[in-house]
């Protein structure tokens, strides 16, 4: 078995780690950074950019730069009304599916495809670092992700060419990292506030056992929302002062979003910061600039409702675990947004103790995923992970009521059955709607899928015995089976239909990704070839100038002609010619050294021949 990596596929940034020498290690990307921006962009010429390089050009290319895509993955139209307003790119909805428009390619992408590009970048860089091709991974998801979001994340891995061995919850992964070497039993609360999601989990940790007691969260709450509060404040203030709505200008909106994020980060260490955006817009009177001072107090005032929302899952998780705050031994902070001082103060107020800050909030989840990867690969022994399902699962019964079969916070993997009957006489079939959520009525919960059991024996209402079995695997992904006891007729559904992508689409995207991999590699090779050739031209000109009086006229003319040819091929992008001429030019540059050495030798010999040695002779007597 090759190396199995652990991946934290984040809303803002992503991290990849692996077990090396029995220790989890974060793998730096090709640029040397330990985190990779979860951003994908396409240039006007169709080139794909992933990571920090994509983020850097977002202001000049807002419609083709895709960020925070994790907030759309596995979701349907009616679930993204809040998030859709916060992006500078165009999110399309058709029926229940979500697509991201890419004007540069005149193409629409599924969120899973964009996430797959980030995963592919992480895995390619890891393969280079490890010296072997990585094909297997453990990927983390927010604990409060529902079934469709988990399945969509797995689909993204598949599109990226990965065999996703396990999907695990981010707080659980963080606990693996925190508690790996802990011998004593501790009750910990993991507070995970990332860029787009928020989770709280309560766990018992110690002596190799990691048992999740409860989990709660909000998949519509994260650092992006804190940024958005600043953005909306700036837009409102500018409109009042200048009469211009910056929210309608995609480029201005992208600049505001970046400035808001920067201000939020700076206010974690400073009590005030400046937002300066020159030439934010223009009127007939000339350019307009945005200058604003933001204090930490103002930021906390703008985000007070979000900070209050963060306390709700904490209280719910404690309640579900049947614990008082005083029972918590340690609070582990995860996610970049936990650096906000008001968040740390809120956690301290709720739990009654200072949060433990011994772990890196940006890397702890990926490190924990690497530990789980090590367990699956057989590299890590004596670890038992007992996770839970975050939301209740059940079926629709008479009157539009949700009947729960597996309650939330049930340890997984698990399997449970319930026997139901019919509500009418002699039905030829029954339709079973699978639901996820905590509300009493079907309409208030999420429908994961519907399937039909045919061939039921004619019988009065209440007589047929239909056994419905729910089976949740270690990834938290559900399959459901219905069986009519009298006839033995059986029907099952794996809730992959909960994914927003049909199976055929996933397979098509996998194929496209494989085809594009070769194209991307060729583009990368061409860029490298071009850069090397331009550098070679510069070096050649420099050497000709430096050794002008020491090389033959013929060699000088030959090199100058090759430089001209190479520059011409570079302009025409004739990559085969570029490689061929580059090789000839390199050989010619080697001749410079030989030529110069021969000239040096001749000069030295000539000097020796011309030298007259003066001395005194005495007459011998």
Swiss-Prot record:
Region (Disordered) residue spans: 596-621
Biased composition (Acidic residues): 611-621
Main localization category: plastid
Keyword Nucleotide-binding attached: yes
Annotated signal sequence range: none
GO cellular component, one term: chloroplast
Pfam families tied to this protein: HSP70
Feature: compositional bias, Basic and acidic residues: 600-610
GO molecular function: ATP binding; ATP-dependent protein folding chaperone; unfolded protein binding
InterPro entries linked: ATPase_NBD, Chaperone_DnaK, Heat_shock_70_CS, HSP70_C_sf, HSP70_peptide-bd_sf, Hsp_70_fam
CDD domains with a match to the protein in the record: ASKHA_NBD_HSP70_DnaK-like
Function: Acts as a chaperone.
Protein name: Chaperone protein dnaK
Biological source species: Pyropia yezoensis
């Amino acid at each position: 078995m090759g190396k199995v990596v652990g991946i934290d596929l984040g809303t803002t940034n992503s991290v990849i780690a692996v077990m090396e020498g029995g220790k989890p290690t974060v793998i730096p990307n090709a640029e040397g950074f330990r985190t990779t921006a979860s951003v994908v962009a396409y240039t006007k010429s169709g080139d794909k950019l992933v990571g920090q390089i994509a983020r850097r050009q977002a202001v000049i290319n807002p419609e083709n730069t895709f960020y925070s895509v994790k907030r759309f993955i596995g979701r349907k139209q009616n679930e993204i009304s809040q998030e859709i307003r916060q992006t500078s790119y165009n999110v399309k909805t058709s029926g229940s599916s979500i697509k991201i428009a890419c004007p540069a390619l005149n193409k629409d992408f599924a969120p899973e495809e964009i996430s797959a590009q980030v995963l592919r970048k992480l895995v390619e860089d890891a393969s280079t670092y490890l010296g072997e091709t990585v094909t297997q991974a453990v990927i983390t998801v927010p604990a409060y992700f529902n079934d469709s979001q988990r399945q969509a994340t797995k689909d993204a891995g598949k599109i990226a060419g990965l065999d996703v061995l396990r999907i695990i919850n981010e707080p659980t992964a963080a606990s693996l990292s925190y508690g790996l070497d802990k011998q004593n039993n501790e009750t910990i609360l993991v507070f995970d506030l990332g860029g787009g999601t928020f989770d709280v989990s309560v766990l018992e940790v110690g002596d190799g056992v990691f048992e999740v007691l409860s989990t709660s969260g909000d998949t519509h709450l994260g650092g992006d929302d804190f940024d958005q509060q600043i953005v909306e404040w700036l837009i409102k203030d500018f409109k009042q002062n200048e009469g211009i709505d910056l929210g309608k200008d995609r480029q201005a909106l992208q600049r505001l979003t970046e400035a808001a994020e920067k201000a939020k980060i700076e206010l974690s260490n400073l009590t005030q910061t400046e937002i300066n955006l020159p030439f934010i817009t223009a009127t007939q009177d000339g350019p307009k600039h945005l200058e604003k001072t933001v204090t930490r107090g103002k930021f906390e005032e703008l985000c007070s409702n979000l900070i209050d929302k963060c306390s709700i899952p904490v209280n719910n998780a404690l309640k579900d675990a049947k614990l008082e705050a005083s029972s918590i031994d340690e609070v582990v902070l995860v996610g970049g947004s936990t650096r906000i001082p008001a968040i740390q103060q809120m956690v301290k107020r709720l739990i009654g103790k200072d949060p433990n800050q011994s772990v890196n909030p940006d890397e702890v989840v990926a490190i924990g995923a690497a530990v789980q990867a090590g367990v699956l690969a057989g590299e890590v022994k004596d670890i038992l992970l007992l996770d839970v399902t975050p939301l209740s699962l059940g079926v629709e019964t008479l009157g539009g009521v949700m009947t729960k079969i597996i309650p939330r916070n049930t340890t997984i993997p698990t399997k449970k059955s319930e026997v139901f009957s019919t509500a009418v006489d002699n039905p030829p079939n029954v339709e079973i709607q699978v639901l996820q959520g905590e509300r009493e009525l079907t309409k208030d919960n999420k429908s994961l899928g519907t399937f039909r059991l045919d061939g039921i024996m004619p019988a009065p209402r209440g007589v047929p015995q239909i056994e419905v079995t729910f089976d949740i695997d270690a990834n938290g992904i559900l399959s459901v089976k219905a069986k009519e006891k009298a006839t033995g007729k059986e029907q099952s559904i794996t809730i992959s239909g909960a994914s927003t992508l049909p199976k055929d689409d996933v397979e098509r995207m996998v194929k496209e990704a494989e085809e594009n991999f070769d194209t991307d590699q060729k583009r990368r090779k061409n860029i490298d070839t071009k850069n090397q050739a331009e550098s070679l031209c510069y070096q050649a000109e420099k050497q000709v100038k430096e050794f002008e009086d020491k090389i033959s006229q013929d060699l000088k003319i030959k090199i100058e002609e090759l430089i001209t040819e190479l520059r011409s091929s570079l302009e025409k992008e004739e990559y085969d010619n570029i490689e061929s001429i580059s090789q000839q030019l390199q050989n010619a540059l080697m001749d410079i050294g030989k030529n110069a050495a021969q000239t040096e030798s001749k000069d030295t010999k000539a000097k020796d021949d011309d030298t007259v040695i003066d001395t005194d002779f005495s007459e011998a007597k």
